Amino acid sequence: IWSESISTTATQLYAMEGKEVRFGEASSALWSALTTQVNNGSVNMMHDSSAPLTGLIALANMLINAIWGGIGCGLQQFIIYLFLAVFIAGLMIGRTPELFGRKIEAGEIKLLAVVILIQPITILTLTAVTLYFPALTGNSNPQYHAVSQVLYEYVSAFANNGSGFEGLADNTIWWNLSTSLALVLGRFPTLIIP
């Protein structure tokens, strides 16, 4: 909310482009933060028009994907964090880590490491491939913000959110297939592996 209320323009006016004027920039930024925490994908502002810090918060919310106890697919991430926290706490107190009467040992932690590494590998690989071939991107902004737009698209697909920075021509075969791959890798390995 703070980042939306300060102006970075020469006119010292609020940047209201892309925001819901009925609610103002503070409520729009709050909704942006909440909608990316609970994986519902609804918007009342264009996230691409938000201030840089507001966009970063939305991106971080989807990367964590376990705020508010992990609603939706975030519940899977929440359970992974729970297993990891129990394992680390068990190591710190010198006991064999247990959760619900079941021991958590090296085998389970190796599987958790695989699940945790799927997120950055999937998102960064798809982002790199998309940016390497500019014809695939369909980006309206060829500058540094293009990286944010592509990264946000894949993070949103992986986190099962559905929002986007929307500077992309993303109704193409490449975007449909690559975001579908990110969506599948965001949902099913966390159900199957642990």
Each PLM stretch: what is its role?
Residues 1, 104-119:
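Alpha-helical transmembrane segments and their helix-start/interface "positive-inside/aromatic belt" motifs
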Residues 5-73, 137-186:
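P-loop potassium selectivity filter motif centered on the GYG triad
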Residues 42-110:
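Long hydrophobic segments that form regular secondary structure
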Residues 130-133, 190-194:
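Membrane-helix cytosolic exit motif
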Residues 119-126, 186-190:
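Alpha-helical transmembrane segments of multipass membrane proteins
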Residues 1-13, 93, 97-98, 127-139:
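Juxtamembrane/interface segments at transmembrane-helix termini
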